């Protein structure tokens, strides 16, 4: 622990800063610090600027803050926020050396570099890399959630504002301030607004303009209010005819969104809430109020960047999932989260209390058909997923032609019922359906997880595979296993689906995970010889490796 006097002495010994003193009140812009020092940061032989070196209590986690004292007197430059604090280092994923004097000196050297480059203009293009970061610091900036198709044309999109009622004892001026901060929701159409539950919110037309500029468009100075000149400079990029047809000329409140394409290929999204104003040619005049909107993108293309690099065309593949139980429920939810947007789910059973602890759904959905409950859950939580539900047996759905296997790019059987899987397999083979099938199942008490990928022309056949089955007694029967077991099987499935659509699988594939047998043995049950013989935790068989040559079905399917 260093005292303020010790820190002052250490800084005074440096040639980076001079005239160091201790600030008695260790508080800057409502932030309380352990120690605040003041000094003149040396930029070159002729110039130095007064800065504050603020040491937080948790400096070992948050590093040191450095503020420029007379920030408003400086030229507008990157890496300084609207309070004059310099953005020094990105701490995400960095292991910080627990050496406070060293951290202070490194921070001062970084601050020196930022100011030098700022005065010379060397780092001006950093504004482009962090455009939205500066836009968010504009005075009275308001959040707007944006879910539209990008890189298209100038057009009208739809939006809504969730307004709340005035609270008891709330002053009118406070209520107005709160309303001005209410989030705005913007979608491609009325249907896309449903993700935010805006059914009772009035829908408004919003002007959406796509701008391509040959020169860089920089963010406005965050120390000043957003100006009408900045707005009109952006409007000048819009062709006259389109501007007049998309944005009304009348004096009324309006919202404008700009999709700005920079010469470097970067794209920025900004918006403005405009009170009053008349459109005259390509400019707005007599605007009463201009409020910047920070666009929080919620379109699928943007959201999926964080989770995958898969070809977006694969998301459009049609997938049929049979069984919405413990395995199927997890598989369906994770397929939706993985970006697949066209799912058909089939299950004739309702969710019961006894399955709550191994199903993705909770008590809220008990006594509802599993497929319909899953659809409700996903539509509430995951955007842009089309789900078709069928609360009936798959055999009936196929024979009555409610669905057709050939309409899908992939079939997943997660029912865990081997007799049903044989029926699916038989129908596929007899009708020469060229759609691949993935079969998923768990073993009793979690001793195993299996995923099998079967291409057209070959067969899934439990008679040809030596796999231990479990049978319950009369009444309510079930195969005992926990939620974690189904999660493991789901992970096998997701990886397999990705490989199928990326055409990484040339042949049939069977993956078996060997689980722990302790729980099974506690119930006085014995493992099979196959379980004992398998030494690997993960066993992978391909092609005809898992075909039993003594099975007529497998031999017939493989031309034996």
Predicted regions and their residues:
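Compact alpha/beta protein-protein interaction domains typified by the UBC
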Residues: 25-91, 101-102
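Structured beta-strand segments within beta-sheet-rich domains
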Residues: 79-124
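A structured beta-alpha segment of the ubiquitous adenosine-cofactor-binding alpha/beta core
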Residues: 375-409, 415-417
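N-terminal charged helix/coil linker that caps or initiates catalytic domains
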Residues: 266-319
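Glycine-rich phosphate-binding loop and adjoining beta1-alpha1-beta2 segment
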Residues: 348-383
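Glycine-rich adenosine-cofactor-binding loop
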Residues: 309-350
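A short acidic, amphipathic alpha-helical/loop segment
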Residues: 334, 400-401, 422-427
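Glycine-rich phosphate/adenylate-binding loop
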Residues: 126, 136-276, 406-410, 414-560
């Amino acid at each position: 622990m260093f005292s303020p006097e010790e820190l002052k002495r250490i800084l005074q010994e440096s040639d980076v800063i001079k005239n160091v003193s201790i600030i008695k009140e260790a508080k800057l812009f409502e932030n309380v610090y352990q120690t605040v020092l003041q000094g003149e940061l040396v930029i070159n032989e002729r110039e130095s600027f007064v800065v504050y070196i603020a040491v937080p209590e948790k400096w070992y986690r948050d590093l040191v803050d450095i503020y420029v004292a007379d920030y408003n007197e400086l030229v507008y430059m990157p890496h300084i926020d609207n309070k004059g604090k310099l953005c020094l280092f990105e701490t995400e994923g960095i292991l910080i050396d627990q050496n406070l004097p060293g951290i202070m000196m490194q921070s001062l050297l970084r601050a020196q570099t930022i100011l030098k480059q700022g005065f010379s203009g060397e780092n001006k293009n950093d504004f482009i890399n962090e455009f939205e970061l500066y836009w968010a610091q504009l005075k009275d900036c308001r959040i707007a959630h944006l879910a539209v198709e990008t890189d298209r044309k100038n057009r009208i999109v739809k939006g809504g504002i969730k307004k709340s009622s005035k609270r008891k004892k709330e002053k009118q001026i406070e209520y107005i301030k709160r309303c001005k901060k209410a989030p705005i929701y913007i979608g491609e159409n009325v249907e896309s607004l449903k993700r935010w539950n805006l059914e009772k919110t009035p829908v408004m037309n919003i002007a959406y303009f796509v701008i391509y500029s040959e020169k860089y468009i920089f963010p406005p100075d965050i120390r000043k209010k957003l100006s009408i000149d900045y707005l009109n400079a952006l409007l000048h990029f819009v062709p006259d005819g389109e501007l007049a047809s998309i944005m009304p000329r009348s004096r009324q409140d309006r919202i404008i969104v700009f999709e700005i394409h920079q010469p470097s290929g970067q794209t920025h999204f900004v918006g403005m809430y405009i009170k009053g104003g008349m459109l005259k040619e390509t400019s707005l005049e007599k605007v009463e109020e201009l409020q910047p909107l920070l666009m929080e993108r919620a379109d699928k293309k943007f959201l999926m960047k964080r989770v995958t690099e898969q070809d977006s065309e694969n998301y459009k593949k049609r997938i049929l999932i049979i069984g919405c139980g413990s395995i199927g429920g997890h598989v369906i939810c994770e397929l939706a989260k993985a970006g697949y947007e066209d799912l058909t789910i089939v299950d004739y059973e309702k969710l019961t209390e006894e399955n709550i602890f191994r199903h993705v759904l909770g008590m809220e959905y008990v006594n509802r058909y599993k497929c319909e409950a899953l659809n409700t859950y996903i539509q509430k939580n995951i955007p842009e997923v089309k789900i078709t539900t069928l609360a009936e047996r798959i055999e009936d759905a196929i024979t009555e032609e409610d669905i057709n296997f050939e309409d899908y790019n992939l079939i997943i059987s997660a029912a865990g019922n081997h007799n049903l899987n044989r029926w699916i397999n038989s129908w596929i083979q007899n009708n020469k359906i060229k759609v691949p099938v993935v079969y998923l199942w768990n073993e009793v008490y979690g001793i195993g997880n299996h995923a099998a990928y079967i291409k057209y022309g070959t067969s899934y056949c439990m008679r040809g595979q030596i796999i231990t089955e479990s049978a319950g007694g009369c009444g309510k029967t079930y195969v005992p296993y926990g939620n974690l077991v189904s999660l493991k099987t789901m992970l096998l499935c997701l990886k397999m689906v990705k490989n199928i659509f990326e055409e990484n699988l040339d042949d049939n594939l069977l993956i078996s995970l060997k689980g722990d047998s302790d729980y099974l043995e506690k119930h006085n049950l014995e493992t099979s010889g196959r379980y004992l013989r398998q030494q690997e935790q993960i066993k992978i068989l391909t092609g005809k490796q898992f075909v039993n040559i003594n099975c007529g079905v497998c031999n017939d399917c493989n031309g034996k």
